[in-house]
Amino acid sequence: MSQSQRNSDGWTPRTRLGRMVQDGDVTSMEQALNSGLPLKEPELVDQLLPGLDDEVLDINMVQRMTDSGRRVKFRCVVAIGNRNGFLGYAEGRDDQVGSAIQKAIDVAKLNLISVDRGSGSWEDSAGGVNSLTRNAEGKAGSVTVEVMPAPQGLGLAAAETVSNILELAGVEDAWTRSNGNTRTTVNLAKATYNALRNASQSRTPRRAAAKQREQEVSE
């Protein structure tokens, strides 16, 4: 393969969407998400949305019995975002904490969504993006999280895990409500992500029609 087919980081696209990004046919993350093509390459996200922030929400040891004895792995829950409308979430497992975190970050890039932000109140100036445009609800396990629009200046009325995710998404003002075993960080985080993704899908029927985006995020 010629050098011109590689970018400066040595990335060789393996998918149609990746090639479209490299050729300049897709130049923004919004275009990529609305293309109807699946995100399968973390490097694609690095090209279109560099400098994403990440937050490790939970680290847990997971033990499993095998023929060779007890095996221990680390499960890391990670959320990523640009704090301006894009958010991703995933879990990663590995024998080493650092590797588990990196795996989660890479998968979170493939789960990236465009958050449906808005002014949050009719009293706020038109065109604001400090909150959500509508109520958003998501579920994971026994946990249900509802995120509701709020006027500018309220801040985030939310638990720490929920607040961290909303901040990564660029949501500055919101009321939230949660039910179920909210002490389980992984389900609380997943339900929050699912709430924002469900709201995003409701304004993009084409993407919502895709089977992958109809289901709640899974491990």
Swiss-Prot record:
Protein name listed in UniProt: Small ribosomal subunit protein uS5
Family: Belongs to the universal ribosomal protein uS5 family.
Cellular compartments per GO CC: cytosolic small ribosomal subunit
Chain ranges of the S5 DRBM domain: 52-115
Pfam family name, one: Ribosomal_S5_C
One GO molecular-function entry: rRNA binding
Subunit-structure text: Part of the 30S ribosomal subunit. Contacts protein S4.
GO terms under biological process: translation
Membrane-spanning intervals of the chain: none
Domain of life: Archaea
HAMAP family linked to this entry: Ribosomal_uS5_A (MF_01307_A)
Species the sequence originates in: Haloquadratum walsbyi (strain DSM 16790 / HBSQ001)
Keyword tags: Ribonucleoprotein, Ribosomal protein, RNA-binding, rRNA-binding
Residue numbers spanned by region Disordered: 196-219
Primary role: With S4 and S12 plays an important role in translational accuracy.
Domains: entry comment: The N-terminal domain interacts with the head of the 30S subunit; the C-terminal domain interacts with the body and contacts protein S4. The interaction surface between S4 and S5 is involved in control of translational fidelity.
